[in-house]
Amino acid sequence: MAEAAALVWIRGPGFGCKAVRCASGRCTVRDFIHRHCQDQNVPVENFFVKCNGALINTSDTVQHGAVYSLEPRLCGGKGGFGSMLRALGAQIEKTTNREACRDLSGRRLRDVNHEKAMAEWVKQQAEREAEKEQKRLERLQRKLVEPKHCFTSPDYQQQCHEMAERLEDSVLKGMQAASSKMVSAEISENRKRQWPTKSQTDRGASAGKRRCFWLGMEGLETAEGSNSESSDDDSEEAPSTSGMGFHAPKIGSNGVEMAAKFPSGSQRARVVNTDHGSPEQLQIPVTDSGRHILEDSCAELGESKEHMESRMVTETEETQEKKAESKEPIEEEPTGAGLNKDKETEERTDGERVAEVAPEERENVAVAKLQESQPGNAVIDKETIDLLAFTSVAELELLGLEKLKCELMALGLKCGGTLQERAARLFSVRGLAKEQIDPALFAKPLKGKKK
């Protein structure tokens, strides 16, 4: 007996839902869909079949009264959305903060968590108070406990003993060093004070042999009368060595030139009157130190005093002839008798110092030349003072600003500042050699103008 045909419902795009009867009861889904697509004139490959929302195999038998849905297939694209979906899912899974979410009752989880934490904190309030009170009691107990001191430490006692011994040794060494410095300072101070004492003694011993500067023709006879003996002695010992040269500057109408090379800048020249058979009277500046040096040199060379005098006279006459033609006027320097005495005393002191120098050192004595360029320079050279004769800064201040400036310039030091500053600067180099002076006190050399 033939099986009854099955009646099924088919639903698809474009025709809605309709009932279709199959040819036989054992008809497959593939045959049923293929015949329907032919009737609708659509390709069967563009659909897939679902039954009750699930895909079915096309080889299954058609069920009576079932509803079959034809779902059109979508044309697949290039793809690439899968990677984006995976990245988004990873970000969602990474976060653990769900407080912004809401529970089933609509409350945010953040508020719910805060209420739970507040209830827990209120519940533990009593425990916290008890713990705080316990800590306070423990702190009081620690403060009330007496410290355990140990006063029998052998190491500490040993350290104290060693420190006491080292302190005693250090004090003794310091006292010895201080006493040695005091003794050396007293010795050096005594040595510095010997020079003024010696100069005062020499001043009293040689008061009869005083010499003065020749101020002009009007005072020539007075100078000859008062210093005849000393002039005769000095004229015999006139210097003629290679290290000493003489030039006669023109003074007044006589036309005699007077200049000399000195062993040191601080020594003073003294005038000696010498008669050599001519009506003109020659005046030659001589220093005690130069006389000693020249006598030794003449003794070594075997020259006689007469030969030395004749050579000196010849050189002086030649110089007079040359200077008489030029006729350059030179201002005379007014000098008092008291100033001449002080200068002569300083000359004797300097001469004695040079005389005490060894013979081999006398040959190395520096020779300075008097400059006659300007009257101001002549004043500076002639009035150079002996700093050893001053014992305080106040005495140097009595010299005045200009005199202190000249002395500082002669030493190559800075000459600016007030009267007190100049006097203090000059007093600080008293008795010091040029190498011992602080380099900061020297004046800076003048720089040429840039072209």
From Swiss-Prot:
Keyword hit for Phosphoprotein: yes
One GO process term, biological-process aspect: cellular response to UV
Phosphothreonine: residues bearing it: T274, T319
Coiled-coil stretches noted in the UniProt entry, renumbered to this chain: 109-149
Record note on quaternary structure: Interacts (via PIP-box) with PCNA; the interaction is direct and prevents ultraviolet light induced monoubiquitination of PCNA. Interacts with FBL/fibrillarin. Interacts with CACTIN. Interacts with SF3B1. Interacts with U2AF1.
Pro-peptide positions on chain: 1-77
Chain ranges for the short sequence motif PIP-box as given in the UniProt record: 39-52
GO CC annotations, alphabetized: cytoplasm; cytosol; Golgi apparatus; mitochondrion; nuclear speck; nucleoplasm; nucleus; plasma membrane
A Pfam family recorded for this sequence: SDE2_2C
Protein's recorded name: Splicing regulator SDE2
Tissue specificity as recorded in UniProt: Ubiquitously expressed; enriched in brain, lung and liver.
Residue span of region Disordered: 182-208, 222-362
Cellular compartment(s): Nucleus; Cytoplasm
Record PTM: Upon binding to PCNA, the N-terminal UBL (ubiquitin-like) propeptide is cleaved at Gly-77 by an unidentified deubiquitinating enzyme; the resulting mature SDE2 is degraded by the DCX(DTL) complex in a cell cycle- and DNA damage dependent manner. Both SDE2-UBL and the mature SDE2 are polyubiquitinated.
Family designation: Belongs to the SDE2 family.
Keyword Cytoplasm in record: yes
Site (Cleavage): G77, K78
Gene Ontology molecular functions: damaged DNA binding; snoRNA binding
